[in-house]
């Protein structure tokens, strides 16, 4: 059954049961003091409201029959998957650079099995959800995401999480090039960097690559009364 989500720059109509909520990298690394972003000098002090909003969005999406996909960014504990000096990721990843500057952190940041890699305590995948590891910013790169979505007839993706200007935007952009409709819930996302990069990322998304809405509006669009209005 179709519903219409009020969004910028215009409303978008979608079928929740042929859509997915994407929770990108809600790991201790990105949202918890003592995690990678915090240790690398980024401000994570305002992530708690974002976590609460993601909980709300996940609950509403699950009740409406949307697929929930959780991403965890990181690599094996030897960082082979991160790429060596021949990879730009080796040179640009702030996690890898932080560990080179602080050798005592080696093996602790974004390593599979570590506390840093784990999802935050408040967000727990449920049976029927899909949890995917990813080795780079985009959730489409070297993962089965595209085939998972296509095999289920899913064309609409609703994005939450951290960081808006890095992994969220990278995944949404790649989805745009693969003919997916991407929506970001702005109050369920958080940037890596100053506030202006959040605004810049959202501007890019709503102007060039997708749509921007918020959690309250999203939940309202998934309510039974909204389906009744469309019907």
From Swiss-Prot:
Pfam families: Isochorismatase. The active site is at 25 (proton acceptor), 134, 167 (nucleophile). Signal peptide: none annotated. GO terms for molecular function: hydrolase activity, acting on carbon-nitrogen (but not peptide) bonds, in linear amides. The keyword Signal does not apply. Its EC number is 3.5.1.110. Keywords: Hydrolase. It is an enzyme of class 3 (hydrolase). CDD domains: cysteine_hydrolases. It catalyses: (Z)-3-ureidoacrylate + H2O + H(+) = (Z)-3-aminoacrylate + NH4(+) + CO2; (Z)-3-ureidoacrylate + H2O = (Z)-3-aminoacrylate + carbamate + H(+); (Z)-2-methylureidoacrylate + H2O + H(+) = (Z)-2-methylaminoacrylate + NH4(+) + CO2. InterPro entries: Isochorismatase-like_dom, Isochorismatase-like_hydrls, Isochorismatase-like_sf, RutB. The keyword Hydrolase applies. It comes from the Bacteria. One of its GO terms (biological process) is nitrogen utilization. Induction: Up-regulated by the nitrogen regulatory protein C (NtrC also called GlnG) and repressed by RutR. SUPFAM superfamilies: Isochorismatase-like hydrolases (SSF52499). Hydrolyzes ureidoacrylate to form aminoacrylate and carbamate. The carbamate hydrolyzes spontaneously, thereby releasing one of the nitrogen atoms of the pyrimidine ring as ammonia and one of its carbon atoms as CO2. Belongs to the isochorismatase family. RutB subfamily. NCBIfam families: RutB (TIGR03614). This is Ureidoacrylate amidohydrolase RutB. The gene is rutB.
């Amino acid at each position: 059954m179709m519903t219409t989500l009020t969004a910028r720059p215009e409303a978008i109509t979608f079928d929740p049961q042929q859509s997915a909520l994407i929770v990108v990298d809600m790991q201790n690394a990105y949202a918890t003091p003592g995690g990678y972003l915090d240790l690398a000098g980024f401000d994570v002090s305002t992530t708690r409201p974002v976590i609460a909003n993601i909980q709300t969005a996940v609950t509403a999406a699950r009740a409406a029959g949307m697929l929930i996909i959780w991403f965890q960014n990181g690599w094996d504990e030897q960082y082979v998957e991160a790429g060596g000096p021949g990879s730009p990721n080796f040179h640009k990843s702030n996690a890898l650079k932080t560990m080179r500057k602080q050798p005592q952190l080696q093996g602790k940041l974004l390593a599979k099995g570590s506390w840093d890699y784990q999802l935050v305590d408040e967000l727990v995948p449920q049976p029927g959800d899909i949890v995917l590891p990813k080795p780079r910013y985009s959730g489409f790169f070297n993962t089965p995401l595209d085939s998972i979505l296509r095999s289920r007839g899913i064309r609409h993706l609703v994005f939450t999480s951290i960081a808006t200007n890095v992994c969220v935007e990278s995944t949404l952009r790649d989805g745009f090039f693969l003919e997916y409709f991407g929506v970001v819930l702005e109050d369920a996302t958080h940037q890596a960097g100053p506030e202006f990069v959040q605004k810049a990322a959202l501007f890019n998304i709503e102007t060039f690559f997708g749509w921007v809405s918020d959690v309250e509006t999203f939940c309202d669009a998934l309510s039974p009364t909204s389906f009744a209005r469309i019907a």
